[in-house]
Amino acid sequence: MRIILLGAPGAGKGTQAQFIMAKFGIPQISTGDMLRAAIKAGTELGKQAKSVIDAGQLVSDDIILGLVKERIAQDDCAKGFLLDGFPRTIPQADGLKEVGVVVDYVIEFDVADSVIVERMAGRRAHLASGRTYHNVYNPPKVEGKDDVTGEDLVIREDDKEETVLARLGVYHNQTAPLIAYYGKEAEAGNTQYLKFDGTKAVAEVSAELEKALA
């Protein structure tokens, strides 16, 4: 079961990824984790990646694809894997195909931007402890104050509305072509494209996922 996950930041992708991994016993493959592991292990691709990063440049698709190919050849990927954060572009999607990676399912979690902004912008944090709250879904006992210490809660930079909107803009620009690409792949019978309503309750989305992947 080889899966690609698509979904905007705040669409609940991470939560459902954990569910799929636990339910079907497949690992999540994150390009960031792979890069760090290859650099630490000092592999040939790791050395190439390190020299590029040290020079302040972006790691090329060729290196990333090489790492993906190495990673999915490992024993824990025998039953499948979950690709998160890759591919991000059409050349990367083409590259996956060229190195012979067959994708069984492309799963999109669809949530309107306005809902994501509400989800993210309502978050409040107590930085010292890491405790987080939400004005609507998980409010503190006293507005703006941490339940335990009574100290002020803050809005993290990442959760500010303008930051969230900027990240969503980047996501849509990058992902709209991929959604069209995998839609065509599904029409051609090369993969299955599944779309879920990410505004539903977590347990409901998980149940729908389990049914679709069974």
Curated annotation (Swiss-Prot):
Q: Which cysteines are joined by disulfide bonds?
A: none
Positions of AMP binding: 31, 36, 57-59, 85-88, 92, 156, 167
Which key words are in the record?
A: ATP-binding, Cytoplasm, Kinase, Nucleotide biosynthesis, Nucleotide-binding, Transferase
Location of this chain's protein in the cell: Cytoplasm
- Keyword Nucleotide-binding attributed: yes
Q: What are its GO cellular component terms?
A: cytoplasm
Substrates-to-products reaction catalysed? AMP + ATP = 2 ADP
Region annotated NMP sits at: 30-59
Q: Which GO terms describe its biological process?
A: AMP salvage
Q: In which pathway does it act?
A: Purine metabolism; AMP biosynthesis via salvage pathway; AMP from ADP: step 1/1
What SUPFAM superfamilies does the entry give? P-loop containing nucleoside triphosphate hydrolases
What GO molecular functions are on record for this protein?
adenylate kinase activity; ATP binding
Residues annotated as binding ATP are 10-15, 123, 132-133, 200
According to the UniProt record, where is the region LID? 122-159
Q: Does the keyword Nucleotide-binding apply?
A: yes
InterPro entries assigned to the protein according to its UniProt record, in alphabetical order: Adenyl_kin_sub (IPR006259), Adenylat/UMP-CMP_kin (IPR000850), Adenylat_kinase_CS (IPR033690), Adenylate_kinase_lid-dom (IPR007862), P-loop_NTPase (IPR027417)
What CDD domains does UniProt report for this protein, alphabetically?
ADK
* Origin superkingdom: Bacteria
How this chain assembles, per its entry, is:
Monomer.
The family annotation for this protein states: Belongs to the adenylate kinase family.
Q: What is this protein called?
A: Adenylate kinase
**Originating gene:** adk
